[in-house]
A protein has these predicted regions:
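Ligand/cofactor-recognition surfaces for anionic moieties
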Residues: 1-679
Length: 679
């Protein structure tokens, strides 16, 4: 029995059972032990070392010899067993490739680009001018991926040691268009620097590391250490498209083997090729679909912290400046907004008159049943489409439908750039729930818009404009999506870019992982001070008088005669009532749920709460005008934003240092006004 004990967590009872089997004569070898308690070996040292050597060097030949060694020298089967060969040391080849003439044999190895290119040339795999793609990493079986990439016109360089490949400058003569990393952990800063220098994408297809049917039925998709190592840490390297590609299948003996999932392989390779096409296709030929968000009727477009209409208009102007075909662009953002209200609207089911007018004058794209069903057949499994029909009826449904059975898709087209509203992803009155996810399939209108973008408009790139839409919240898996999950199907193989607020990292991660989006950050509105300190000036003065009275009482108890002590108590009561009068006048007592009886003084703790509340409001950060893409902050707004972001971390760091030096105590922490004054 071979046990890979890396990270293995078993109970004491389970461990005892394994030890009992080993003591009873069952041959057991544990490898990659991370917990010494799990190191259970019932072989002699020679046998254990021999098996470790076979495993450590890997390869078909070594594994075959290892099994023969087990049969002959451990299991005692001496008849009809081939003599095990000596261990073949693992080659340190930089590049590997299956032998096209003997694909089931050991992979061939190469240490020079010239030698590998000669091999490719000899086997008809080196195409002049073809994109070159590097594959690296260990969390997958890349044979089918390499073959499919080559079949679709690429030259593939499977690399064992990417760091060495870059460090020794062997990569310099490859000029790759993309890197594919079958990731388990970070590659490191060296790859970040290289990707930035070359301006090429890094893809990280996922190995779900279990039977395909188990993964497809799992609502989570991936979790724990595999999520961290396969999705989270590769994002630090700049990886995009965490697309489930590899899974396990059983052979005729019931053993599991990792392979590329056939339908996923087709989509992934098409995705990689589509990104590479963007590098080479002239800008005036690229077709771009941009989705924006707005509520029904005359509601304005929306995106967190952004002035949408002028920002979208600035993007269109910039695309035109960069050579994209943007025809018929209006003269101003106001005019663009008017056009969107007329031709790119979203309607509630109640707005029959406005809907009829839109269908006549809004120039929607009209989709026939034949078109729609042909597109659905390409991307959706029958059972997924059955969910749609069950919830919304047969195409075209009741919404955005014409009398002759076609479905209207709102859009504004400017040459090769089309603007589309994102329709509601469900039905009902709870807009927040519809945007942030339900368990139901999206309606025909939602699906048809995205499928028209893919197959009708034939977009080269998909953009979602602003934070945030509903696509990344459609059902079902959290990450490592399958072909049964709606974002996976509606994005398809399109390169996807999401203009996303830099202030919403958490939901941005959802867009990256569930909608395969490359995030392009936009700024939050600038930060300003609240400017309400003047409102609380009288209150602050009264609290200062009260604090002085508290100090006088504390000192008087030990040093002053009883008469002066009584006078201090009277002053303290008077000061507390004065604070209370101002606090009640300002309504602070309601916020803090304090009483408003003006003849009963507040306690010291209650006044401390009032002081901290007022100080918190006085120092609270507020945001200024909404951000417009392409328009930099004014200098004053840059300064106020930097102060707002940096002041508190610096102040609390200084406080921490003063506490270490015994220059500050808990009193400073409790009194926000004192903290603000000192730091």
């Amino acid at each position: 029995v071979f046990i890979n004990a890396m990270g293995m967590r078993i109970t004491e009872e389970q461990r005892a059972q394994i030890k009992k089997a080993a003591d009873g004569g069952l041959p057991i070898l544990t490898t990659s032990v991370t917990n010494p308690a799990n190191e259970i070996i019932s072989l002699d040292s020679i046998q254990a070392d021999t098996l470790r050597s076979y495993l450590g060097n890997g390869g078909r030949r070594n594994y075959r010899s290892m099994l023969n060694y087990v049969r002959k020298h451990i299991d005692g089967k001496l008849i009809s067993v081939d003599e095990p060969e000596a261990v073949t040391e693992r080659s340190n080849d930089m590049i590997y490739h299956a032998d096209p003439k003997k694909p089931d044999d050991e992979e061939l190895g190469f240490n020079t680009i010239a030698g590998y290119n000669a091999f490719l040339q000899e086997n008809g795999l080196l195409q002049e001018g073809a994109p070159r793609i590097i594959i690296t990493g260990m969390m997958g079986e890349p044979a089918d991926l390499i073959r499919k990439l080559e079949e679709t016109g690429n030259v593939v360089y499977p690399v064992r040691n990417m760091k060495g490949f870059i460090g020794r400058h062997q990569i310099d003569s490859v000029f790759p268009s993309a890197v594919i990393n079958m990731a388990h952990g970070r590659m490191g800063d060296y790859i970040v620097d290289y990707l930035a220098q070359q301006n090429i994408p890094l893809f990280t297809p996922l190995n779900v590391n279990r039977l395909v049917e188990e993964w497809e039925n799992d609502k989570m998709g991936m979790s724990g250490g595999f999520l961290s190592q396969s999705v989270v840490t590769p994002e630090i390297d700049g990886a995009i498209r965490p697309f489930a590609l590899f899974g396990h299948y059983r052979d005729e003996e019931g053993l599991q083997h990792a392979f590329a999932i056939p339908e996923r392989l087709e989509t992934f390779v098409e995705t990689v090729n589509n990104y590479i096409k963007l590098q080479n296709k002239p800008n005036n030929e690229k077709r771009v679909a941009i989705y924006y968000y707005k509520g029904p009727g005359q509601n304005a477009m929306a995106a967190a912290g952004m002035e949408v209409a002028p920002s979208l208009y600035n993007l269109l102007l910039h695309l035109k400046k960069e050579g994209y075909k943007v025809d018929g662009l209006p003269a101003s953002s106001k005019e663009l907004e008017r056009m969107i209200q007329a031709q790119g609207a979203v309607f509630g089911t109640y707005a029959e008159g406005a809907f009829d007018n839109f269908m006549k004058n809004g120039h929607p794209e009209l989709i026939t049943k034949e078109q729609y069903e042909s597109w659905v057949g390409k991307v959706l499994r029958p059972e997924k489409y059955a969910e749609v029909v069950s919830s919304f009826g047969e195409f075209p449904g009741e919404y955005m439908a014409t009398d002759d059975g076609r479905l209207g898709v709102a859009r504004l087209q400017f040459g090769n750039v089309v603007l589309l509203p994102q329709n509601a992803a469900g039905k009902g009155d709870n807009a927040f729930k519809i945007v942030h996810g339900t368990d139901a399939a999206p309606p025909h209108t939602y699906i048809a818009s995205y499928l028209w973008t893919q197959f009708g408009f034939k977009a080269d790139a998909l953009i979602h404009f602003g934070t945030h839409g509903s696509l990344e919240f459609t059902p079902k898996k959290q990450v490592a999506l399958s072909s049964n999950d709606w974002p996976d199907r509606l994005v398809g193989a399109l390169p996807h870019f999401y203009i996303y607020s830099i202030g919403n990292v958490g939901e941005g991660m959802i867009a990256k992982r569930r909608a395969y989006a490359g995030l392009q950050s936009y700024l939050t509105p600038p930060f300003l001070e609240s400017s309400v300190r003047g409102i609380y000036r009288e209150l602050v003065e009264k609290i200062k008088i009260y604090n002085n009275a508290v100090n006088a009482c504390s000192n008087g108890a030990h040093e002053q005669e009883s008469r002066k002590d009584m006078r201090s108590e009277v002053d303290l009561r008077r000061a507390s009532l004065a604070v209370k009068a101002v606090a009640v006048k300002l309504g602070i007592h309601r916020e803090l749920e304090l009483d408003s009886v003006l003849t009963v003084p507040y306690t010291e703790d209650e006044i401390l709460r009032i002081e901290n509340f007022a100080e918190e409001l006085a120092t609270e950060k507020i945001t200024g005008q909404l951000y417009t893409m392409g328009v930099p902050y004014e200098d004053a707004r840059i300064r106020s934003s930097v102060y707002a972001m940096a002041t508190e971390p610096i102040a609390y760091s200084l406080l921490a240092l003063d506490k270490l030096r015994k220059r500050a105590d808990e009193k400073t922490v409790k009194h926000r006004a004192l903290f603000t004054q000192h730091y």
